[in-house]
Amino acid sequence: MRDIKTYLSVAPVLATLWFGSLAGLLIEINRLFPDALAFPFF
């Protein structure tokens, strides 16, 4: 039971850190390369 409580307290923290860093990465990519849906490579 203690392991389950430890897991339930760790998983939201890791998920928050992961999604926060992912959102920050996407924001920085969109800041450096705006309008990424239409890359003007052609």
From Swiss-Prot:
One cellular component term from this protein's GO annotations in UniProt: chloroplast thylakoid membrane
Gene Ontology biological process: photosynthesis
Localization: Plastid, Chloroplast thylakoid membrane
Pfam families: PSI_PsaJ
Keywords: Chloroplast, Membrane, Photosynthesis, Photosystem I, Plastid, Thylakoid, Transmembrane, Transmembrane helix
InterPro entries per the UniProt record, alphabetical: PSI_PsaJ (IPR002615), PSI_PsaJ_sf (IPR036062)
This protein's record includes keyword Thylakoid: yes
Transmembrane segments: 7-27
UniProt keyword RNA-binding, yes or no: no
Functional description taken from the UniProt entry: May help in the organization of the PsaE and PsaF subunits.
PANTHER family, per the entry: PHOTOSYSTEM I REACTION CENTER SUBUNIT IX, PTHR36082
Protein name: Photosystem I reaction center subunit IX
Origin species: Chloranthus spicatus (Chulantree)
Lineage: Eukaryota, Viridiplantae, Streptophyta, Embryophyta, Tracheophyta
